Amino acid sequence: MIPIQLTVFFMIIYVLESLTIIVQSSLIVAVLGREWLQVRRLMPVDMILISLGISRFCLQWASMLNNFCSYLNLNYVLCNLTITWEFFNILTFWLNSLLTVFYCIKVSSFTHHIFLWVRWRILRWFPWILLGSLTIACVTIIPSAIGNYIQIQLLTMEHLPRNSTVTDRLEKFHQYQFQSHTVALVIPFILFLASTILLMASLTKQIQHHSTGHCNPSMKAHFTALRSLAILFIVFTSYFLIILITIIGTLFDKRCWLWVWEAFVYAFILMHSTSLMLSSPTLKRILKGKC
């Protein structure tokens, strides 16, 4: 049990972080969206950033509403908000993974014919890959939607005697729901790890073939990408730690520790959002022109 003062402190920190992320996401979408309307085309990285900005904007609002409803025990509202949060959470994970893959194929200096073929395919079918991420998020939340519908029905009949068979089946269904949600997050995490390893290998190769006295543009691109990926790795790891704590949640008072963990995780998400803004050449060029 933590003091109420600390709970309020971390709650305020979390709200400030969330509002900052919302402003950053809105800025990314507004600036790049205007550029899209003017030139009628965007680079793939900017397409990802616009999609990620929209997804993160919606995710952050869903997260705030979901957490406050959970803290206040508003179960009826919470059941509906959880679906929205899960959808944008999975979509954000996949978009972040696609961003790492794009960094890998654009920055890495490998010349193997298989790598070059994969790079060509990804760049050619990039809009369809983005649509595929949206489809995966939609399919993944179907079990959650069914589970939440059942949960709402049980809440409306909570004054009636419970059937143990129905309760057991519901618990098994929730286990399946958790497994499907975990798989939907593990796959992009594996893609992220593979892309990071390839980038590190490419960076090592660049260091071996260039003098250490100066840093060429290729090296700078590697370091910029790896900095963003390092922050994203912390975000992914932090999220999986929260899942672990959720599993063993009986050891903690969730209402007390909720804001501590949310403030911790969204601090890294805020860092990553800032890093994404600095990693887009188009966004930096437009913002510098406005100043």
Curated annotation (Swiss-Prot):
Which species is the source of this protein? Answer: Pongo pygmaeus (Bornean orangutan)
One Gene Ontology molecular-function label: G protein-coupled receptor activity
| Parts of the chain on the Cytoplasmic side | 23-41, 106-125, 204-228, 279-291
Other known facts: Most taste cells may be activated by a limited number of bitter compounds; individual taste cells can discriminate among bitter stimuli.
| S-S pairs | none
Q: Does the keyword Hydrolase apply?
A: no
Q: Give the family from UniProt.
A: Belongs to the G-protein coupled receptor T2R family.
A GO term from the CC aspect: plasma membrane
Q: What's the subunit arrangement here?
A: Interacts with RTP3 and RTP4.
Q: Which UniProt keywords apply?
A: Cell membrane, G-protein coupled receptor, Glycoprotein, Membrane, Receptor, Sensory transduction, Taste, Transducer, Transmembrane, Transmembrane helix
Which positions does UniProt annotate with glycan attachment? Answer: 80, 163
Residues spanning the membrane: 2-22, 42-62, 85-105, 126-146, 183-203, 229-249, 258-278
Q: Does the keyword field hold Ligase?
A: no
The name of this protein is Taste receptor type 2 member 16
Please give the InterPro entries that the UniProt record associates with this protein: TAS2R
Q: Which SUPFAM superfamilies match?
A: Family A G protein-coupled receptor-like (SSF81321)
| Pfam families found in the cross-reference section | TAS2R
Q: Which ranges of this chain reside in the Extracellular compartment per its record?
A: 1, 63-84, 147-182, 250-257
